[in-house]
Amino acid sequence: MNMKTHIIFIALFVLASSSYSQNTIISLSKSTENRFDITQIPTIIDTLEVNVKLANIELLSNNKSSRLSNYIELSSSGLMKIFDAGKPNIPVFSKLIECPLDASVSFKILGYDEEIIDLSAKGFNEKIIPAQPSISKSEVPNKFYIDTIAYSEDKYYNADIIAFEDAGILRSVRIGRVEIRPIQYNPIQNKLRILNNLKIQIVFSGSNHSKTEEMKIKYSNSAYDNLIGNFVPNLVRQQQSRFVKTTYVIVSDRKFQSTLIPFIAHKQQLGYNVIVGYTDEPNVGRTTASIKNYLKSLYDSPPSGYAPPLYVLLVGDVAEIPSFQMPWHVSDLYYFDYTGDNLPDVFYGRFSASNINQLLPQIEKTIEYENKTMLDTSYLQNAVLVAGFDNSKEIYTNGQVNYATNQYFNSSNQITAYTYLQPEPPNANYSADIKSKINAGVGYVNYTAHCLSSGWANPSFERSDIANLTNEHKYGLWVNNCCNSNRFEILECFGEAAMRASNKGAVGYIGASNSTRWDEDFWWSVGFKTVSLNPPYNANNLGAYDKMFHTNGESPDVWCNTQGQLLVGGNLAVQQSTSYFKLDYWEMYHLMGDPSLAIHIAQLCVANFINQTVTANTTVTSCREINVQNVTVTNGATLTLEAVGNIYIQGVTVNNNSKLILDAGGEVNIISNFDVQLGSSFEIK
């Protein structure tokens, strides 16, 4: 360690939820809750306005028998901890915003109400606890960090009220992270400086609006834009034509050509423009560089009549389609970043297979699931949610599972959740019971704690167990927030085994190719929220769970409907955070499976309107998508199609003074035979 940092290590430091025994709430205003809003000013171009209101702060004093008896913890709803190791842990607000291309970012502090709080006068003579580094799930924390210089200076820490971090371009949106610091701390005077009713302007200078609009016209897609719609004020919203067929690119080894035929036909039938590149073709090649160049060329300059790709599927194991070798893990991320900023510009996945026998089950399970040809779909109303064993981190594992069940996986949403919390009761036999539930059929599996590349640590569920599963025709999405379960450069990791299994296993698998972290995994699923056993919902800080559901009044624009969206949506929750390991999460987390596959939890939520003649006013609604085939609207009737997701049209005729109204939260995909005859009309809302 460089001694110039003046950071001292104290051995065997463990932060546990039980360390703090007393708490004091200090009211700061008459408000009942904190507010942190970023809005666009309609009358001022290139300016956003930030408004911060603090209702109270909470001080938690340490159990005097603990090693941490010299410290107190400061918290406030919606404010989050930092990871500046050794410096005072003064929580901050953090939010993602949209920025115009080429713009530089500056700030104007318009005003605030200042309040000084003397902690000693409130009975707190201890220092505020120092921030600690993010902890990997593969390590045992045994060091305590304190920056002696930071604690010996007679000045307010966090004096910079606002900071900006440029993240990059996510397909059609340039995003950045704004960090607001309304609380400052002087460790010598033992005082807090509160900046309440804080008002700030974020000013964009040198914005290239024409370039921004061009980017949106070319690349804007609701599936991507919607992921950030919840927390990004849209400075420019250029409407692209919604009559567009989505481009789906497959990169495969030639030996899989005949096996892929039904999958390609299936995707084409759903309305995708499918492009297939084989690695023996000169413009594709077998190296990471050549494949990346091939994909980037399609993204930058798609063939005539094609939109830039939205989905990309790699078909083959690393011997067929190599992955990028990072210092400590493999990553497919860089196949899908076309702007050089480490953010993906398409949704992506991999069918990992070395031979046809490994590939065919993945194709068959995907087509069956997407076509809803299972004889019994009721299993989709079941979920397995597992908090794995770690006796010092139950606040993370149980907190994540509790959030999932309290908010979403419950009877209010017609879901039966099989939950496994820690500690495991005597004779509960979690491991056997979990496998039994999966055999009976579940639509969603989520595990958080420790893994190896071979599977879950405790409760045990390993690669060798997958061969004994019996969940034929009852496949679901498995999401694993743990280390190495998707370490796909080895012969066969847990995620690959789950996907390759014939007539059993998973239809999609999300997991990491390296060691994950406690805070970041929690945020990936729950959102950027304070870790607790029962975290509350926060509309400003959405995680993967929130983005799959809509029971808290979220706009449909922010839902994650597909497996590829969920992967990106979870990583965006980490991107919003104060973590220093955001790039690791983009690199490590992978989807084994079809990125375009819609996630079905509980009700299928897909409306099929087929072989119908509409002679009276009719409305068809769906909370995901509508498939329309061979429909005639006549006799002056109005047919209204309302979908949260996409509308797919294969054969529609509107005649005899009739009307068709299309209201899609996603895209309207005209696949074939769209005929609106003279005297009739159609409308897009």
Task: Locate the predicted segments by residue.
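Catalytic-core segments of thiol-dependent peptidases
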Residues: 296-328, 389-390, 396-492
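Bacterial Sec-dependent N-terminal signal peptides
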Residues: 1-24
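Active-site-proximal C-terminal subdomain of hydrolase catalytic domains
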Residues: 276, 319, 387, 487-603
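Catalytic cores of nucleophile-dependent amide-cleaving enzymes
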Residues: 337-371, 453-540
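Low-complexity, Pro/Thr/Ser/Gly/Ala-rich linker/spacer regions in secreted
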Residues: 233-243, 601-620
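Extracellular pro-sequences of secreted precursors
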Residues: 21-280, 287-311
